[in-house]
Amino acid sequence: MKDHDVLFRSIRGIAYISVGPLILLTSSLWFTDDKTAYIMAHLAQIYFSVLLFFLCGSIWSFRDYDNCHYKTRITVISLIPLAAAVTGAFFSIFINPAWGILLMLVFTFGIRHLKIINSMISLFDDSYNNLFDKISIILCICLVLILTYWVNPYTYPLEIYN
């Protein structure tokens, strides 16, 4: 087995294991009572923000490699998840959680279409690009489910924030 295969398998395993609790929290929103779901929705958003902070740190650590040409690009790319988590938390605290989740959803979905990110992702193999696409889709689905919980017209959990 080549070193590349082992590296990809370990990165893929880490990615799926780290997204697993978010999937569990998101799906449990719809199977619990309203008071518990309210807490789980906040926990899911906090966990997603923690994932973004870890992503920021992981990308930031790539700056120390020898290639100085990509150092500024990697710095800019590493600040995007940090900005998404901080502004999402700001909107959730000062407006309501639906706006924070919506902002993080737009960041997560829109990130893939930025030119600076596409130019960096094209440097990797197709297997990494496919993994990035799959994890992005999973995260977007989780965020859509959390957003759907917050704007549910039957239980209307946002009435606390009015």
Question: Which role fits each region the language model picked out?
Answer:
Residues 1-2, 42-64, 162:
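Hydrophobic, membrane-facing alpha-helical anchors
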Residues 9-30, 137-143, 147:
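The first (N-terminal) embedded transmembrane alpha-helix
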Residues 12-15, 69-79, 102-103, 127-135:
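Cytoplasmic-side transmembrane-helix entry/capping segments in multi-pass membrane proteins
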Residues 50-55, 104-117:
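Alpha-helical transmembrane segments and their membrane-interface exit regions
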Residues 61-91:
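Helix-adjacent hinge/juxtasegments
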Residues 91-110:
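Transmembrane helix-loop-helix
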Residues 116-141:
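Interfacial loop-to-transmembrane junctions
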Residues 145-162:
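Juxtamembrane boundary at the C-terminal end of a transmembrane helix
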